[in-house]
Amino acid sequence: MESRFKLKEEYHQSCCAIQVRVPVIKTSSTKRKTELYTTGPFIMRSSSPSQPPSIKAQHRIAKHKAIRRRRIDLNCGCSIFYHIKCADHGFTHRGEHHCASGREFRFYLGGTKSPLFQDHAGGRSSIHTDKDIPHPSQVQSQPQESTGSPQSIPELPSLDDIDSSFWDDIFK
């Protein structure tokens, strides 16, 4: 009768494994990693004594990793999610400067309480009203075309104005 070797559970931390003989079990239906040796299949067990962390520990870690963001709804219909540590910084979107102060933020709640796609008729606009900051228009103006030469190239004299003796000296 063939035999199979496996590690004794109480010696899993030892660098020298003790093997015991057990009856052969077909491993075609199990998903264990096996290797064939001359004495038969050998089950490869993990040498690590540690257990995977419990689900409660994983949930506790996940709760602390949440990224806190706030949401700004703009007049153009765009929504911008702003990191909470970036408060009191402004930004420009589609040629309009926006202030990111605390009044202009709303927390994104999600689900049925989500402010997404809701009509907010009242409230302050998030457009910056400071007159010192230039507010360029949506369309960029193009420079006027001129018929003269560009400024970087000086005017060249007409070839007709050059004396014929000049040409005679060049083509001798």
UniProtKB/Swiss-Prot annotation:
Domain of life from the UniProt record: Viruses
Location in or out of the cell: Host nucleus; Host cytoplasm
Location of the region described as Transactivation in the Swiss-Prot/TrEMBL record: 158-172
InterPro entries hit by this protein: Gemini_AL2
Keyword annotations of the record: Activator, DNA-binding, Host cytoplasm, Host nucleus, Host-virus interaction, Inhibition of host innate immune response by virus, Metal-binding, Phosphoprotein, Suppressor of RNA silencing, Viral immunoevasion, Zinc, Zinc-finger
Disulfide bond residue pairs: none
Record GO cellular component, one term: host cell nucleus
Keyword hit for Zinc-finger: yes
Bias-annotated ranges (Polar residues): 137-152
Post-translational events: Phosphorylated.
Chief site of localization: host cell
Motif (Nuclear localization signal) on chain: 56-71
Sequence segments annotated as region (Disordered): 119-172
GO molecular function, one term: zinc ion binding
GO biological process, one term: symbiont-mediated suppression of host innate immune response
Positions annotated as zinc finger (unnamed): 76-93
Function of the protein: Strong activator of the late viral genes promoters. Enhances the expression of the capsid protein and nuclear shuttle protein. Acts as a suppressor of RNA-mediated gene silencing, also known as post-transcriptional gene silencing (PTGS), a mechanism of plant viral defense that limits the accumulation of viral RNAs. Suppresses the host RNA silencing by inhibiting adenosine kinase 2 (ADK2), a kinase involved in a general methylation pathway.
Family: Belongs to the geminiviridae transcriptional activator protein family.
UniProt free text on domains: The zinc finger and the transactivation region are involved in PTGS suppression.
Subunit architecture: Monomer. Homodimer. Homooligomer. Self-interaction correlates with nuclear localization and efficient activation of transcription. Monomers suppress local silencing by interacting with and inactivating host adenosine kinase 2 (ADK2) in the cytoplasm. Interacts with and inhibits host SNF1 kinase. Binds to ssDNA.
Protein name, as recorded: Transcriptional activator protein
Organism the protein comes from: Bean golden yellow mosaic virus (isolate Puerto Rico-Japan) (BGYMV)
